[in-house]
Amino acid sequence: MFRNQYDGDATTWSPQGRLHQVEYALEAIKQGSATVGLVSKTHAVLVALKRNAEELSSYQKKLIRIDDHIGIAIAGLAPDARVLSNYMKQEALSSKTLFTRPIPVRRLMSKVAEKAQINTQEYGRRPYGVGFLVIGYDESGPHLLEFQPSGLVLEYLGTSMGSRSQSARTYIERNLDTFPDSSREELILSALRALRDTLSKDQELTEENVSISVIGKDEKYTLYDQNDTKEWLDKLGDKGPAAARASRAAAEEPQAPTAEAILDSADAMETD
């Protein structure tokens, strides 16, 4: 991906009007493990696939609580995520201290976007190599937003980021109309199904490699532990993409007519 003299700094434009350092930061997000976010009229959900650097190491933390009404899922460089998540926590605390109220979700993300965008304008800086999915609940209801290193923040009904995330987005696009009216349980299970589609053939969802969080009306940000995660995976049923595809194929396969159905059909064809 070497771009000659046009990728040496974030402030250097290419002749095609591109900032290659920003594009490289977006590529870092694609190297992270998949995360999925969904929102309904009452709740917002994040699920994430955790990785361990090697067999003997612990799994990397993917979901981070910012405040009682905000949480994030990260994809990309974990150290950059730590810097930005700490900044978000400070801003949330400042709002409570100065204004005695939780900071609105969009306002917090606007502050984070400004901080990230500065790194694309000043010489000697680099864009943050991490992206967020953000869920929150404030006076205007539940929210799901996506943050990108360029400083772009978009609001979604459902989305995914990270490695193999296109498979999850395909599932979300096919079922988008069902999410607004989904219950809390249905929304979590739908997010897990989308996450399951990002797995390779030899992988499956387990309580060790999956994180689940939810927020909603009269419900603070909740991050489930392994025991609770296992219960959700048991409700999901098929935990791997191969088994899920086999189940869907079996459900869609036309059934052979029974003997009673054949006899009924023959009787119906008789005429006087």
Curated annotation (Swiss-Prot):
Keywords: Cytoplasm, Nucleus, Proteasome. Its main location: cytoplasm. One of its GO terms (cellular component) is nucleus. GO terms for biological process: proteasome-mediated ubiquitin-dependent protein catabolic process. Pfam families: Proteasome, Proteasome_A_N. SMART domains: Proteasome_A_N. Residues 243-261 have a biased composition (Low complexity). Residues 243-272 are annotated as: Disordered. SUPFAM superfamilies: N-terminal nucleophile aminohydrolases (Ntn hydrolases). It is found in: Cytoplasm; Nucleus. Belongs to the peptidase T1A family. The 26S proteasome consists of a 20S proteasome core and two 19S regulatory subunits. The 20S proteasome core is composed of 28 subunits that are arranged in four stacked rings, resulting in a barrel-shaped structure. The two end rings are each formed by seven alpha subunits, and the two central rings are each formed by seven beta subunits. The catalytic chamber with the active sites is on the inside of the barrel. The proteasome is a multicatalytic proteinase complex which is characterized by its ability to cleave peptides with Arg, Phe, Tyr, Leu, and Glu adjacent to the leaving group at neutral or slightly basic pH. The proteasome has an ATP-dependent proteolytic activity. This is Probable proteasome subunit alpha type-6.
